[in-house]
């Protein structure tokens, strides 16, 4: 039983330090960043996306290569180029039975979309649902300054 919030934080830090064999910093998060306004690719009627707009694909699924369990995410992307919306939807759906880690999924998406549309600027962020309490939200960008901040979608 803990009497103060600081005791919880101390216990978490101590356990993580021991587990990772390193010095871990931990703090309470009292406010989460808002998820960006986006245009939902799942319901988009336009043939192509518009440059420099934020688009999201809700309900992305891949398969964990270790456990064979499904991993679900929302994929956010922005590009300086127009992208074919139906191609993107088919592409994201093609991962449904693919066994890959979150980070590799986002890296592959970045490379494939960049190459398919010759994008000069592109950023993709995968907001994966937690499994085992671990928050994995990889982002890949052509820019050093990231557009997507660390935010949580309501289903994370």
Task: Name each model feature, range by range.
Residues 1-156:
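N-terminal intrinsically disordered, cationic/polar leader segments
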